[in-house]
């Protein structure tokens, strides 16, 4: 558990959580549900620690880039259009863990990331095509989903991530009334 006080003051300048009063004690499920800045700042800080209490910006950024690479965020998706090269944050380590770094991702790169989360680790080569047909309607080529990589982590961890994401949908009213089951 991590105790969100509302202000992450392990770095200078301090970083405020969106909920200024603090969320209190959080596990990862609740941190995802509440999108707690403090929680994810602490993860970035802890992953950058060397020794007892010394923080290494470089180590923290290296860890972020390592994990981003596992889920395919450091490479193009493979879609049949020109695509910008993704960039995983290389500055401001701690705020980067809550998405406030200098990341650069296209919509398709973020869609692939969401698919990795939803499929418990399948990193797909994306395609916009289902099939190509000639003028007579005959299929020339069909495109099947292609798994480029698999993130091998415990199913328990995927369950925790999925539960946290499900809680986002079930807890917040912005998703009410859509007429479809979202999660």
Task: Tell me the role of every PLM-derived stretch.
Residues 1-183:
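Beta-lactam-recognizing serine transpeptidase/beta-lactamase-like catalytic domain environment
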